[in-house]
Structures are given as C-alpha cells and as structure tokens.
C-alpha cells in the first residue's frame, strides 16, 4: 500500500493518479498544523466576541441573514450535513470516493477553513482505514460547491448514512466501529467547510483526464499500426512540416509517431516506390488532429491540478487579519470548462480512430481484402466491428455537448448561476469507455491488416504492440464470435498495454 505525506496545496498529478488507482496511507505534513490551528482560533474569537459571520453563526444560502444563537451552533452544523445529503443515483466506487476525500483533506489543511485538526485527522483516518462513505453520483450542480456529494461524505464522520468497509455496505456507525474509529461532533463553521468545495467535480474530471491520457497514447500507437497496415507514408510526420506551423502539440505528436514508426520497416520498404502521392486525412493529418487533442489534455491538466490544490471553501478565514470573507471559490466553472474541452478531445480521438478503421475496410483504399478477411462473402470479417465503432463515435458526439453553458438557478435564486461541473466531468467516463472500445477495434483491425501483409513486419515497438494482442487474440482465418475479442482488447488497453510504449507526453 502506498504511503503519502500530504503537504497541503502541493499534490502532483502522479500522486492524484496513485490515490485514484490504489488505497493509500495518508499522513499530514506537520507544516500544516499552525495554519489550521490559527484559522480555528479566528473562528472561536468571532463566536466569543459576538460578531456575525456567514456560515459561523448564520443560516445558509437565502437564510444567510438569520442569526443563530451560540447554543445552536453545533446543531446548526450537524443539521446542515443531514439536510444537504440529498444525492441520488448509483454510489460512486471506492476509488472515486477515496480521491474526493483526499482532495477535501488537501483543501481543508490549507488553513483557510476554520476546521479543527481533529476533524481533518478523522477524515485521514477514514482514508487510511478504507472506510468509504456512500456518495450517490448525482445531485450537485457545481455551485455552491458540491454540496450533496460532500454532505454524503461528511455523514460518515457523524456516524450517519452508510459506508463501505472491506467491500461491504454497512451503517456508518458500524463501519466506524469495525475500523476502530469514532464519530465526531462538529463545531462552528465545520459543517460548511466540509460541504463547500469543488472536490467531487474535480475528482470526476480528474478521472476523465487520467483515462484520456491512456486513450491518447493507445490511439497514437494504433494510428501508427494502421499507417503500416494500409501502407501509409512516414513523410507526413517529418519534423520540418510541424515546425513550420509551430503548434507544440502537433510537433510533439509527430515526434511520437517518428518514435513508434522509426525511419523504416520491412512494410515501409515494400511500398517505397509506390504510385500513391498522398494518404487520406485520417492518416496524413494525425499529428494535426491528435496534436490539438494533446493541447486540450495539457490545458485540462493545468486547470485541474490547480483546482486539486485550491481552497474552494466559502467563507474563507484569513487568520492573520482576523477576518472571515465571503466569496465564490466554490463555483466550479474552471472545472466545467476544462471538462467540456476534454470531452472534445476524447470524442475526436475516437472519431479519428473510427475513420482509420473504416479506411481499412475499403479494399480500394487499404489494398487489403475487404473487411480484412479472406474468402469474403462466406466471411464478413470486421464488417460489423466497424459498425460498432461508428455507433460509439456517434454516441460521443452527443455526449460532447458542453455542460458549462447550462445553468439553472437554485436556492430561491440566491445561487442564480451554477457550473454543472459534476455532470461535465462524470460524462467523460462514458465517453472514455466508448473511445476505448473504438480503439480496441482499431487495434484488432490493424494487427489483422499487418498479418495479411504475409510475413512483412513493422518497427520493433509496433511489433511489440502486435505481439501483445496476439498473445491473447488469434489471427482471424475465418469468422468467429467477435465480441470477446473486443472485450479482451479493451481490457488490455485499460491496463495500459499500449500506453507503456509511448514516452511521456504530458
């Protein structure tokens, strides 16, 4: 199990990926403690002095003008958590819940939230014990923060709701007891600090980014395989072409293709003096299209990494000045827009892959047997596999519709513009699954195409990609049940079988 020392505000993308992929033992760096304690002292001073401050001794949302008596402050925070735990839909899996929890801890430990160290440590204890609150997938509009998901997370701290422990759903009180933990009672400001924030939206989009990175790398490998399978030219990847345009993503993608294809191969030599002048766009323009996608991935990474380390609470406690200031850091518009742009990239990666599959089906374009199988007519080969890829690509076009342009006012128009970031991030998962299915079909098709070149081989890395598939999926000599092969190739992609062939590109 990974051990991680959390220095608030300094999480890296690789650390976030590890948190998503694996259970973690978390430890808070001691440098955070003074800031946490100072913010709590500031909140305590406000209460003691009888000053009015939003979220500390007032109601919430449209009820912000309602002053709460000191004796009701603890009940106020508990009531907030209970009432806001109103999510619906399937529970998030343990990996997603773990990522949300670590993001929440990272934000709270920055020392701007007025939440006690003991509560932050209780959250850390949940992560370390593998107690995962039941968080429904739906119910947040991404402003004022991810209220419903984070309320469900916070329920477990109070011993309410349900949680998973060692793979079993249990009443939260029972899960805590089995893990040797105790519920906590919240003090002034703490319920709001737990609920306000963009951590669910950010976690949703981060998963989309992690999957998009794998898809991008896999698609570049499969694009190179297809280039070889249909006797495509290496010339469009010449560095001089891309330097002349100056788009960095395009330059870097062309470099990846040169790395994978190398200068030549037995296949390339076999058509060195062919009559073709230019390849179709789906081959020739791969650096331009995939380069644009890479640029979106990089920009999304920049936004999400900043948000993962951000303080997205409200109000914020500035202990050095003794002030509590209301703002709008809970508004997840940066995450929503980043997720929308990432959706375009995921859709285009799949769309270009589908076009390359279609190219291989056409004997006039590919110079291969129709649908990549001998004895056509008796055998249908990849005919319907390409239809499946087309169906998935079409679904992604609809799913790529932007969410950040939508808004519905909530809380009696007090919260009159929202981001829809959770939905923007969550749909990326379905899009990624669709695109992975498309790339799986291309991998199968491209390897079949190279097989049909009768003993000619590609570059060492591309031959490794072909061998990886052939260890699990045999060459098609005649029709057979196709779906298990797509499923197998899809699983290999998800495990990073092709991604590991590509140098770091982010």
Swiss-Prot record:
GO molecular function: histidine ammonia-lyase activity
Statement: the UniProt record of this protein carries the keyword Transferase: no
Location(s) in or outside the cell: Cytoplasm
Cross-link (5-imidazolinone (Ala-Gly)), chain numbering: 143-145
Alphabetically ordered keywords of this record: Cytoplasm, Histidine metabolism, Lyase
Modified residues annotated as 2,3-didehydroalanine (Ser) in this record: 144
CDD domains the UniProt entry points to: PAL-HAL
Main location group: cytoplasm
InterPro entries named in the record: Aromatic_Lyase, Fumarase/histidase_N, HutH, L-Aspartase-like, Phe/His_NH3-lyase_AS
Gene Ontology CC terms: cytoplasm
Reactions accelerated catalytically: L-histidine = trans-urocanate + NH4(+)
PTM annotation, UniProt: Contains an active site 4-methylidene-imidazol-5-one (MIO), which is formed autocatalytically by cyclization and dehydration of residues Ala-Ser-Gly.
Pathway membership, UniProt: Amino-acid degradation; L-histidine degradation into L-glutamate; N-formimidoyl-L-glutamate from L-histidine: step 1/3
Transmembrane segments: none
Domain of life: Bacteria
Record family assignment: Belongs to the PAL/histidase family.
Annotated protein name in UniProt: Histidine ammonia-lyase
Gene coding for it: hutH
